[in-house]
UniProtKB/Swiss-Prot annotation:
Lineage, opening ranks: Eukaryota, Sar, Alveolata, Apicomplexa, Aconoidasida
Assembly and binders: Component of the PfRH5 adhesion complex composed of 1 copy of CyRPA, RH5 and RIPR; the complex is formed during merozoite invasion of host erythrocytes specifically at the interface between the parasite and host membranes. Following the establishment of the junction between the merozoite and the erythrocyte, CyRPA dissociates from the complex. Within the complex, interacts with RH5 and RIPR.
Protein name (record): Cysteine-rich protective antigen
Post-translational modification: N-glycosylated.
Biotech utility: Potential candidate for the development of parasite blood stage vaccines. In vitro and in vivo, induces neutralizing antibodies capable of inhibiting merozoite invasion of host erythrocytes.
Length: 362
């Protein structure tokens, strides 16, 4: 069942009533309903080439990477906060480091604090034994304490890393931050079974020496893997990554679920979210049910949000001014078990935000 919404101002309760009555009338198989409420626009004067959104103390933040090449050829990593209909820049973290080039960014958000790591980015084949990182700590989202740390790279020496925002993962009553990587490609089986690995910190990112073993038997030879990101929800671990001939020719987008086997070991297997003529964008959960976003493979003026693989919303991005609207980089930002934001860039400097509510009907 596809439920299209194109109006900007519809009350939450009106939508709930319509959806519940509709589902009753057609005898929906699923007992779960999700709906989209008001659409809002946010403007950004900074040309971000990468956005990393998160919720902290009930407010929306963005880590913006500005690395456009120009006369100055400078890199900026801004921490921004949503204030009304704009992103307000609070801090430029990169200028407080001695790093060169575009770094890896790993952000960890807990109830009371934000911890952001900026780590030097070298090609995995040229990576040094140790990796220099700057650890930024904040308990208000505005001011950040900076300390330089060194991470021994023996665990992830041959792994390709990608930037992401994550929650802590609790294993046997201890919380860990994870940095995870994937073998970018293999031409022959080396029987190591370490194609995906994570190193972990139990002291909020100050030291990194714990190895998390990820057992994944569906790694294929002769293809490239990239953009690996862990998903942590209610202490369940999953991964999202891309598979293709090369980074510009994506053949598939994989999502794998992991089960804690013993100690610091997990067993992971594929979860099939692939749909014909649709490109998987992002995955999250609401009340233990998956919510998945897709772009239209042939027309990014449309994107879809599926809940429980049954009900879906069709989103046609609304124009802001005279710009051409699209649905690019769709990302879920979970508020709680009943609400999530769906954020995408509709045009340069313009972000569309949809609020999605979870509801039950009897």
């Amino acid at each position: 069942m596809i439920i299209p919404f194109h109006k900007k101002f519809i009350s939450f309760f009106q939508i709930v009533l319509v959806v519940l009555l509709l589902c009753r009338s057609i005898n929906c198989d699923s007992r779960h309903v999700f709906i989209r409420t008001e659409l809002s626009f946010i403007k950004n004067n900074v040309p971000c080439i990468r956005d990393m959104f998160f919720i902290y103390k009930r407010e929306l933040y963005n880590i913006c990477l500005d690395d456009l090449k120009g006369e100055e050829d400078e890199t900026h990593i801004y921490v921004q906060k949503k204030v009304k209909d704009s992103w307000i820049t609070l801090n430029d973290l990169f200028k407080e480091t001695d790093l060169t080039g575009r770094p890896h960014i790993f952000a960890y958000v807990d109830v009371e604090e934000i911890i952001i790591l900026l780590c030097e980015d070298e090609e995995f084949s040229n990576r040094k034994k140790d990796m220099t990182c700057h650890r930024f700590y904040s308990n208000d989202g505005k001011e950040y304490n900076n300390s330089e740390i060194t991470i021994s790279d023996y665990i992830l020496k041959d792994k390709l890393l990608s930037s992401y925002v994550s929650l802590p993962l609790k294993i046997e009553n201890r919380e860990y931050f994870l940095i995870c990587g994937v073998s970018p490609y293999k031409f022959k089986d080396d029987n190591k079974k370490d194609d995906i690995l994570c190193m972990a910190s139990h002291d909020k990112g100050e030291t990194w020496g714990t190895k998390i073993v990820i057992k994944y038997d569906n790694y294929k030879l002769g293809v490239q893997y990239f953009f690996l990101r862990p998903y942590i929800s209610k202490n369940d671990l999953s991964f999202h990554f891309y598979v293709g001939d090369n980074i510009n020719n994506v053949k598939n987008v994989n999502f794998i679920e992991c089960t804690h086997e013993k100690d610091l070991e997990f067993v992971c297997s594929n979860r099939d979210f692939l749909k014909d003529n649709k490109v998987l964008q992002d995955v999250s959960t609401l009340n233990d049910e998956y919510i998945v976003s897709y772009g239209n493979d042939n027309n990014f003026a449309e994107c879809y949000i599926f809940f429980n693989n049954e009900n879906s919303i069709l989103i046609k991005p609304e124009k802001y001014g005279n710009t051409t609207a699209g649905c690019y980089g769709g990302t879920f930002v979970k508020i709680d078990e009943n609400r999530t934001l769906f954020i995408y860039s509709s045009s340069q400097g313009i972000y569309n935000i949809h609020t999605i509510y979870y509801a039950n009907y009897e």
